[in-house]
A protein has these predicted regions:
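Sec-dependent signal peptide recognition
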Residues: 2-10
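C-terminal motif of bacterial Sec signal peptides marking the signal peptidase cleavage site
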Residues: 15-18
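Acidic/polar surface patches and capping/hinge elements
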Residues: 20-333
Length: 333
């Protein structure tokens, strides 16, 4: 009788253990996985030559999609509808059960970027690699399928929010034309490129009350007189000598997405990451070096990307208010 009881206990244990083996054990992701998605977006931005303000918009909404998923599972994270302007609340869908919310967050970022970036469809290649790696880790097809459905629901919600930010109206505005006044902006040779996003200050900000909430002091008054402050600033370009270290630092922060260089009779276009992508990369390094959790990293990336877009809205508002010629233009003249 004792032997029978013992065998019954062993059988129950084996059945319980076996059933648990079929259930999806939790698989965790790291901050690097978030950065990998953003790096994939950056590669497309370089490919598409996305301008800096627009690049910040792509980063912001992708991160918002990822954060929305994570915040529905982490009570310590504040809800976006209490932070962002006119952001509608979204409850976790009841129809989603066996999902990995971390995987859903990454997929929501990818899905949002796929719809917003000009060449976003190319991200399907990265998405497939991500899902293949999940299968190798032991994710079941049910978990992957449910995670994708969850991501699509959140991404659709965020894309609707993005569509309402008024960026899609900019194409209806008249083409920006220089006013021709001395010291005002004018296309710079050799490319003579048009003004970049002159109406970006009309886009709805995330956290600002208005685009001119932090209006800076006007720049030094333009003047060609040798005793003027503007002329003195111009001459610093010829008087100051930079060390090799300072030149390397300057080159490090040179984030012009598309610079045109004249080399004899040739014009060469050089494509680089945007300023926003530079800061996203730095954010990734900071999260990795401090061993931030996936959830905390998603919060940090979202704060940085939202701040980048609001920062561009403020800067571009002043850029076209002060209407100052580019330093390169002044130097060439």
């Amino acid at each position: 009788m004792k032997v029978l009881k013992f065998l019954m206990i062993v059988l129950v244990f084996m059945l319980t253990f076996g059933c648990n083996q079929h259930k999806q054990s939790p698989k965790s992701f790291k901050s690097q996985d978030i950065l990998n998605v953003l790096n994939g977006m950056t590669d497309l931005m370089i490919h598409d030559i996305s301008n800096p303000p627009l690049a910040s918009r792509f980063f912001a909404y992708a991160c918002i999609a990822g954060y929305e998923v994570v915040s529905q599972h982490d009570k310590d994270l504040p809800k976006l509808n209490k932070i962002l302007n006119k952001y509608p609340a979204l409850q976790k869908p009841d129809s989603i059960e066996e999902s990995s919310y971390q995987l859903s967050a990454l997929l929501a970022m990818i899905e949002t970027a796929k719809k917003m970036q000009p060449s976003g469809s190319l991200l399907i290649q990265y998405e497939n690699l991500l899902l293949d790696s999940c299968r190798i880790k032991g994710f079941s097809e049910e978990t992957i399928d449910q995670s994708k459905k969850y991501a699509l629901i959140v991404s659709k919600h965020v894309l609707a929010y993005a569509k309402a930010d008024r960026y899609n109206r900019i194409s209806n505005y008249p083409r920006y034309a220089p006013d021709g006044k001395p010291g005002s902006w004018y296309p710079t040779p050799p490319a003579y490129m048009a003004a970049v996003e002159p109406y970006f200050n009309t886009v709805r900000p995330f956290t600002l009350d208005t685009c001119n909430q932090f209006q800076p002091v006007p720049p030094v008054e333009f003047s060609t007189k040798k005793n003027s402050d503007f002329y003195k600033l111009t001459m610093l370009n010829y008087k100051d000598s930079l060390s090799d270290e300072h030149q390397q630092i300057a080159a490090f922060w040179d984030c012009n997405p598309f610079a045109v260089q004249d080399r004899g009779h040739l014009l060469v276009g050089v494509k680089k990451i945007s300023p926003g992508a530079h800061w996203i990369g730095i954010t990734g390094i900071a999260c990795g070096n401090t061993n931030k959790s996936f959830e905390k990293s998603m919060q940090v990336f979202t704060v940085v990307s939202v701040g980048l877009m609001d920062g561009f809205i403020c800067c571009w508002d002043e850029k076209f208010r002060s209407n100052r010629l580019r330093p390169e233009t002044a130097i060439r003249r």
